[in-house]
Amino acid sequence: MSQEYLDFELPIAELEAKIESLRAVSGDDNEINLDDEIKRLQKKSEELTKKTFANLDAWQISRMARHPNRPYTLDYIQHIFTEFEELAGDRAFADDKAIVGGLARLDGRPVMVIGHQKGRTTKEKVLRNFGMPAPEGYRKALRLMEMAERFKLPIITFIDTPGAYPGVGAEERGQAEAIARNLREMSTLSVPVICTVIGEGGSGGALAIGVGDKVNMLQYSTYSVISPEGCASILWKSAEKASTAAEVMGLTAERLKELDLIDNIVTEPLGGAHRNYAETAQNLKARLLTDLEDLDVLDKDDLLDRRYQRLMSYGYC
């Protein structure tokens, strides 16, 4: 997969292009040794990357959360879990490809894993509906959660959606009801539920698989009731105010952690999760194992009581 850079990363991209050019020259001519120059540029690129990513604003983080090379749910399943067996369909209407889920093992332990799935190519994006589930996607997710509860399996969800699909067909088939039912049922599941925002956490479409005992966010993910562009269009009648909206919305992992709306922030590699899938997955796996260990000691009543208290603590009074 070719590396793509956002506009604020362009100075880094220029350095990386120079490094690749020197490597090509050095490889084509064995008499030319450019190792020292390559190392110098690599060090300069690393320092520039550290400086750039130490000062990202909310709008830049919003764009990182949507980076086209960012790992999606199936990428994390491949790197974190073993023996994944995908389960399909809501047993009522259709199989929504914007939601994937199934049985898997986490360090040998059986779990149910569910998540939003986006596409990379045009064909994949259409197949996955750009990561925007219809009601049947959320009903599929609920079916898998109820199955996990019957077999006493922990549930792990990965959130990455701009929002639930707002099409006429989705509304006719009960989009709001499907989301509301998931919120209600997830709050009463008798097994541990761990939710992680891996990219975009957009509105009710994210919440529909986001009610859990632990809620984590990757370092450069976002979680909000609306996109910065949508917020700007409503408040200032112009999407060009998206950067201002992003700042006031408090959608970053750091801000949400300050508000106690999430439990943990999972560190990403320098430059973002798309720079190193394996390292990101390793960090996330460690977080999931720690969370499961914390929740395993709770009996059903304690688990449900703690989840209830967590939900009741949200907001200001």
UniProtKB/Swiss-Prot annotation:
Chief localization class? cytoplasm
Q: Which biological process terms from the Gene Ontology are attached to this UniProt entry?
A: fatty acid biosynthetic process; malonyl-CoA biosynthetic process
Which GO cellular component does the record give, naming just one?
Answer: acetyl-CoA carboxylase complex
Pfam families tied to this protein: ACCA (PF03255)
Q: Which residue numbers delimit the CoA carboxyltransferase C-terminal domain?
A: 40-294
Show the catalytic activity.
Answer: N(6)-carboxybiotinyl-L-lysyl-[protein] + acetyl-CoA = N(6)-biotinyl-L-lysyl-[protein] + malonyl-CoA
HAMAP family per record: AcetylCoA_CT_alpha
Task of the protein: Component of the acetyl coenzyme A carboxylase (ACC) complex. First, biotin carboxylase catalyzes the carboxylation of biotin on its carrier protein (BCCP) and then the CO(2) group is transferred by the carboxyltransferase to acetyl-CoA to form malonyl-CoA.
The family annotation for this protein states:
Belongs to the AccA family.
Q: Which NCBIfam families does this entry report, sorted A to Z?
A: accA, AccA_sub, PRK05724.1
Protein name, UniProt field: Acetyl-coenzyme A carboxylase carboxyl transferase subunit alpha
Q: Which organism is it from?
A: Actinobacillus succinogenes (strain ATCC 55618 / DSM 22257 / CCUG 43843 / 130Z)
This protein's encoding gene: accA
